[in-house]
């Protein structure tokens, strides 16, 4: 496939796939060699401002001298916009190489009578391949559905996985990982701290209130 054909294939995925479980995402990552374990992930969730927050975090890390990947959605013009390395959108060749690896895996899974990765899973898997091959130190990842429903959750190296959310309601949606840090802040009239503590009681991570 060339670049245009690859994009057309991805855009057509929702027509022939259904939502998969998180176990499916983990299995795909494993069969790709667990590329997500080659860097640290900052997983950003919340109602509004996720993309801006991801960009801010990436800029700060770049100023500190780190190599960074950025994964956001949706794209505005071209699908490549979802993937940035050191604040630069990836080129078509990089996109196509990652697609070919994920497409090969997808074909193998279908041939085995298993599942085909969803639209978002396909892009997420491509992103992990792209960032691993680029050798980045950090990846700032904007959540998709988020929480227990999102394929971008619970697949990361927990020793370096930080989560930022607009209030601990994000934590209560099961985004926070055992062994990781969670950064949150209060807003509105609900007792977000109490909610965060209730959820965090079952986790081994630290809750830092700002």
Segment roles from a protein language model:
Residues 155-210:
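Conserved catalytic-core segment of NTP-binding enzymes
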Residues 40, 69, 138-139, 169-171, ...:
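Structural motif
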Residues 10, 47, 68, 140, ...:
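Residue-level signal for inorganic ion chemistry
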Residues 29-30, 34-37, 63-165, 182:
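ATP-dependent carboxylate-amine ligase catalytic core
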Residues 1-46, 53-66, 71, 107-114:
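Short functional linear segments
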Residues 1-20, 86-87, 141-146, 155-156, ...:
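N-terminal-biased segments
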């Amino acid at each position: 496939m060339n670049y245009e054909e690859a994009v057309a294939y991805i855009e057509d995925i929702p027509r022939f796939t259904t939502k998969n479980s998180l176990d499916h995402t983990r299995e795909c990552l494993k069969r790709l060699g667990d590329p997500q374990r080659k860097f640290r992930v900052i997983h950003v969730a919340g109602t509004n401002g996720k993309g801006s927050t991801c960009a801010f975090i990436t800029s700060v890390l770049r100023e500190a001298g780190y190599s960074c990947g950025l994964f956001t959605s949706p794209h505005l013009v071209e699908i490549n916009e979802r993937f940035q390395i050191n604040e630069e959108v990836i080129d078509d060749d990089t996109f196509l190489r990652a697609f070919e690896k994920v497409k090969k895996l997808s074909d193998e899974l279908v041939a085995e009578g298993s599942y085909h990765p969803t639209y978002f899973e396909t892009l997420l898997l491509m992103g992990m391949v792209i960032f691993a091959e680029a050798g980045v130190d950090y990846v700032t990842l904007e959540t998709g559905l988020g929480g227990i429903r999102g394929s971008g959750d619970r697949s990361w190296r927990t020793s370096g996985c930080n989560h930022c959310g607009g209030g601990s309601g994000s934590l209560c949606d099961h985004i926070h990982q055992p062994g990781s840090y969670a950064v949150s802040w209060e807003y509105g009239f609900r007792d977000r701290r109490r909610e965060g503590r209730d959820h965090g009681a079952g986790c081994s991570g630290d809750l830092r209130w700002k």
